[in-house]
Amino acid sequence: MRLLFVLLCCLAGAAHAEPARTPPPKAYLTLIIDDLGQNLPRDRRVLALPGPVTTAIMPDTPHATEFAREAHRAGKIVILHMPMDPATGPYAWHPELPLEELQKRLDAAFKMVPYTAGINNHMGSRMTAQPVAMAWLMGELQRRHKFFVDSRTSAQTVAAQQAQKIDLASVSRDVFLDDERTEAAIFNQLQTAISLARKQGSAVMIGHPYPQTLAVLERELPKLKAQGIEWIDIKQMISVRSNKATPAHGKNGIYR
């Protein structure tokens, strides 16, 4: 009788036990810092950030080659921050240039920035809206085994769309951290990226090596893990997204 009573108590306890909690869905962030190569002491703060930051280096800067080598030695992913119209300079792409000149400028830019795994556009609101040039670029990057990051400096961009058409490894930016250059605004943008990552599973951030941006990142990035956020590098993010557009950039995974 006593044994029966004990068994009944155990069964009653099991009936009221809390159900096993399902782990929260994964939330991934990746970070690109643009406009590098201009100021070595400043840019080295980017290399000291505690995680897999992607370094986007401009070819027409005084320290482009040297900093690319430093970033590579530091284990950071290096990408070419390719100037595009309305950017100016000897490497900049403009819609009126023939494809032969675009290739010449791209070749020269890659020579200035060694160890590149891919590229993203610097400015480029006019250039990334050009279907023919963007289709050519994506084919060229595929030939070179490099990926593309669409900075989405314009709502009219067709760059990621053209990359997706040929299944080139690519991803699009979700959040600019520092359009407003104050620590409070940058912190808020970081929180926006974190919220977006929780909502859609991932978020791609782009920032710049401004003192305010670096101060916020140095303070807040070490806290990501405790917030349930996994900071991954850009190659991992491309894999996570599988070349699919997020709802903000397309429909049913297809870029519009």
Task: State where each predicted segment sits.
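Sec-dependent N-terminal signal peptides
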Residues: L3-A12
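Catalytic-site microenvironment of enzymes
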Residues: F5, H16-R256
